[in-house]
């Protein structure tokens, strides 16, 4: 059987039908209609339904959900890339890497946050951000993009800046699109972060609207496609992570704008 050359997995973090329906209602209202406007994702020819409970709770969190999507294994809330007993589980990204695919991980939130982390890291706690970041090296994935890093210098602020650590070990870390286009060309492994988070912690569960100089999700995805190229097959996980953050803050317009950006 012929295998797909390009595989994209899009994840709307914390997104359910209610978020989609609210966004479509907003679009219909703008057109002066009572319903009828549909997002691109709502027009796909096939739908599937899945249970979302984790191994220890009816309500999952992003690390347990991300692990389930990445590996097919349900786990406990707060666990990342491990089973309920703490044994590492294998992400589909590693399976595809072994099958000759280049790998890209793209998100609107920190690259060491729960959903992206589930595709390359294993940790008993999703909040061990610095250690999760260090596991980027083990992955050897070719492209990462996100807002930046949580715990930039470790939990206590006493570790080496994580971008310097990663650069010392073979990754090019670029902040913003201009820096990416200038520095990433010809590099094997690249991490694209937002210009607004250079040399500092990325924001966490903050949904205050896009920062003007920051790249959009579509722009980061385009950079990933460009970097991975067409010589080898590739897999990209692309997450609209701040959809969830708008939900945490009970802020409907950030939810709507982030769903639209994701769509």
Task: Tell me the role of every PLM-derived stretch.
Residues 114-119, 197-209, 224-225, 229-263:
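Active-site His/acidic residue clusters
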